[in-house]
Amino acid sequence: RNSWYHNTIKDFIAQGEIGELAIIRVCHMTPGLAPGEGHEYEGPAFHDCGMHYVDIARWYAQSEFKTWNAQAVRMWNYKDPWWLQCHGTFENGVVFDITQGHVYGQLAQTQTHNSYVDIIGTKGIARMTHDFKTAIVELHGVTQTHRLIQPYGGKNIDTLCKLFAESIETGRRSEALPEFRDAALASEYAWRFLRDAREHDLPAIGELETLRQIRERRRTMKDGYGLLRKHA
């Protein structure tokens, strides 16, 4: 929520440049943490990582989830799904789809990823892509067209700490800060979407041997996605 690109897009929406907000599309697929590396204590990937995108979709919609349908895959025959896509509606009629998985070319010679936010209105669009170093925001409104390129900014923990400190000093919570309720709802709905996926066909594709190869490769990688650093 503290990212410059999300706030730029939200401001553009507030200006009426895309008309009425209609569709929110969020995707985050990387060859990141593999099963067994460090997710289990927080659940499958869609909860540990995907809950952030559940939150950002709800933040854009400014409404609560109403309906949903989820499809997942048990990649490499692992016990839990490591890729999930959910689509549905919010109470205000806005439609969403969220795609998340750390299954994106784990054994590719040169790894890559696919991450974006795509906001579609009745008149225009706003979208963002990034490569974890640089973020590109493209705004196509009824009176404005912009292409903004700035440093990605990571998780912006420094901004979060700054807002929190200012809230303590002033005795008033910054409206830019999420509430505990927001975190609880993001977690709750990530679990709900996972449970919904388990009620549908949940195919297992691939073999555990491939997962073993992935873990071994990641264990020896010097530069990769979401590598766990071991300190002596």
Where are these regions (language model features)?
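Residue-level signal for the nucleotide or nucleotide-sugar donor/cofactor binding architecture
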Residues: W4, D48, K155, P178-R181
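Short glycine-enriched, charge-decorated loop/helix-capping segments at active-site entrances
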Residues: E40-P44
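Contiguous beta-strand/loop segments that form the cofactor/metal-binding neighborhood of enzyme cores
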Residues: D48, H52-I136, P151, D158-R173, ...
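Short arginine-rich
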Residues: Y189-H200
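A contiguous active-site-proximal alpha/beta segment in oxidoreductase catalytic domains
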Residues: R1-P35
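Glycine- and charged-residue-rich phosphate/anionic-cofactor binding loop of Rossmann-like
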Residues: T145-I149, S167-L185
